[in-house]
Amino acid sequence: MDLLLINGPNLNLVGKREPSIYGSQTLEDIQEELLTLANELGANLKFFQSNSEGEMIDCIQNSVGSIDGILINAGAYTHTSIALRDALLGVAIPYVEVHLSNIYSREEFRHKSFLSDKALGLVCGFGANSYQLALEGIVSYLKRV
């Protein structure tokens, strides 16, 4: 089972940017923990991070035929990008939306997601553990289909 975790804009700053909201673990630390968990779950996990919407779309499109499931934290693009939504729908790869913070307990403009209604699920608000929960969820789903 091959999985891809896509992180969007500013997530390269996790651990440094607003730690009271996003936590103190760096993206590299989170990814290291996820690799261990993925291995335990029998999954291969690849990582991609970009601040560019176009690069994220290219990554999604290039995943066809090589990736069984996607975990995506689109960052601020969650609330603005119909293009990311269209890319995810276009490749028809199951995906789980992930956020470190609870987007529904923050500013009103963060309450709208262009991704969640078509996702297998949405995990938010558990800090770095959101990624682990999302990983466990998508692996469980893919083992059943």
From Swiss-Prot:
Keywords: Amino-acid biosynthesis, Aromatic amino acid biosynthesis, Lyase. Signal peptide: none annotated. The record marks 17 as: Transition state stabilizer. Pathway: Metabolic intermediate biosynthesis; chorismate biosynthesis; chorismate from D-erythrose 4-phosphate and phosphoenolpyruvate: step 3/7. One of its GO terms (biological process) is chorismate biosynthetic process. The active site is at 22 (proton acceptor), 99 (proton donor). The keyword Zinc-finger does not apply. It catalyses: 3-dehydroquinate = 3-dehydroshikimate + H2O. Its EC number is 4.2.1.10. Pfam families: DHquinase_II. Belongs to the type-II 3-dehydroquinase family. Catalyzes a trans-dehydration via an enolate intermediate. Homododecamer. This is 3-dehydroquinate dehydratase. It comes from Prochlorococcus marinus (strain NATL1A).
